[in-house]
């Protein structure tokens, strides 16, 4: 009877050690973390001259779902999007943001990246920008660069 308890105890300890050595790092690597973004005119391509600015948080989860919002000031935005392109380049819209007020925009519920878009995100090749009537191609921008 004493041997059975020792075997159970050893197996329990071995299971716990296995989780912390293997499972815990995997769980930590797959957790989503919000990216703080700071949008500015000098990140646009080509750069523009404006006093507008913006900030917010965009979260991309390992299941490829996207959430977040941005707030802008010093401009009258007409549209906001997440695009796919490297820093210094322009790219196609992949997620149109939803206007919440004159100064806030949010990622729509259920937004999700494709496998290829998620790889681009991991490589730092997604960006968010906000358009205006004065700057139809974009007035302020921030690259989404995961840590």
Residue map of PLM features:
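Metal-centered catalytic cores of metalloenzymes
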Residues: 2-5, 22-80, 84-147
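Bacterial N-terminal signal peptides
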Residues: 12-24
């Amino acid at each position: 009877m004493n041997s059975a308890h020792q075997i159970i105890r050893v197996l329990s300890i071995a299971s716990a050690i296995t989780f912390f050595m293997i499972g815990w790092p995997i769980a930590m690597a797959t957790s989503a973390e919000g990216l703080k973004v700071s949008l500015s005119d000098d990140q646009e391509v080509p750069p523009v001259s404006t006093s507008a600015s913006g900030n917010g948080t965009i979260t991309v989860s390992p299941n490829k779902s996207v959430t977040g919002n941005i707030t802008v000031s010093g401009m009258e935005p007409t549209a906001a999007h997440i695009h796919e392109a490297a820093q210094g380049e322009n790219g196609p819209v992949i997620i149109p943001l939803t206007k919440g007020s004159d100064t806030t925009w949010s990622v729509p519920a259920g937004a999700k990246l494709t496998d290829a878009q998620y790889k681009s995100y991991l490589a730092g090749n997604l960006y968010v920008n906000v358009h205006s009537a004065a700057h139809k191609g974009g007035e302020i921008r921030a690259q989404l660069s995961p840590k």
